From Swiss-Prot:
Changing G210Q: In mur1-4; strong reduction in L-fucose in the cell walls. NCBIfam families: gmd (TIGR01472). Its cofactor is NADP(+). This is GDP-mannose 4,6 dehydratase 2. Expressed in roots, flowers, siliques, leaves and stems. Not expressed in the root meristem and the proximal part of the elongation zone, or in emerging lateral roots. Expressed in trichomes and guard cells, and in pollen just before anthesis. GO terms for biological process: 'de novo' GDP-L-fucose biosynthetic process; unidimensional cell growth. Transmembrane segments: none annotated. It catalyses: GDP-alpha-D-mannose = GDP-4-dehydro-alpha-D-rhamnose + H2O. The lineage of its organism: Eukaryota, Viridiplantae, Streptophyta, Embryophyta, Tracheophyta. Keywords: GTP-binding, Lyase, NADP, Nucleotide-binding. Homotetramer. Binds to GER1.
Amino acid sequence: MASENNGSRSDSESITAPKADSTVVEPRKIALITGITGQDGSYLTEFLLGKGYEVHGLIRRSSNFNTQRINHIYIDPHNVNKALMKLHYADLTDASSLRRWIDVIKPDEVYNLAAQSHVAVSFEIPDYTADVVATGALRLLEAVRSHTIDSGRTVKYYQAGSSEMFGSTPPPQSETTPFHPRSPYAASKCAAHWYTVNYREAYGLFACNGILFNHESPRRGENFVTRKITRALGRIKVGLQTKLFLGNLQASRDWGFAGDYVEAMWLMLQQEKPDDYVVATEEGHTVEEFLDVSFGYLGLNWKDYVEIDQRYFRPAEVDNLQGDASKAKEVLGWKPQVGFEKLVKMMVDEDLELAKREKVLVDAGYMDAKQQP
């Protein structure tokens, strides 16, 4: 699916004949997204395409494509007039690939969403997490800076931060709240945050940090607790699973809808001056509350199915994250549209339908459900 498009910017700009009133249509803005195949990347791509952008995504080469979240908007690049999303091979661990594609694509905006983003996994692979999340951001910032110097162009940069950076700092957490990271992932995100601030202050780069609190959707990875719950719930409802094993049910998070949060990313890069913003719903809910709403929605009692497994507790727990997004609301004019219960039910609906399709395959003998508890 990835394309090697080495054309200049003029090749990818919209070329529209003047209308009768001689008004010339402005060229399309071009965005470059790392992590385009992830939850946030897919929603941001949809959002930017809706704004008339041409979107380029950087994807890693692997043994199989992980593009299911963007397949519905992919158009073969040979269809030049309609293919406004293009994919290219690159990696945040490879500085030369980042610089090469920025020079080729000539983006107006760069959104760095790629990461090893699982907190628990970061304890297992801390070196890799730091290389991708922290040093990867530094490589991309340097590629953008070098490109702007050589080309004389202005490129706006968005860095995806995380509420995990606050760690054990008491809520509510705002842009002025001190960081106290409690995992290799969170520490790496702190480094990326300060690299972004440094490049803004030292080189005048238009660079923003979005400190996003937990944001979920039906596209959330199945190894994250919210999606793990709704995925298991769907399978339990149709008889494919009997147990769900979880860790700390009292952990409280500020959960929003990922589709809402990508608008805030874009709004940050439309301001006159770059700055950092917390993006959150300003509501806190525990994992147990998520279980109450999700299982209750399907008429089930979660206590009949959930068991606690110590392996899912982190070496250093983060108990309570709840954001103060007043700055984003005031400056950006942003506010969340999807509330907690609506979000949970949205995810349950999608995963129930997925489980029903899965059951058809299991009943037909095309899948084996025995690996589930």
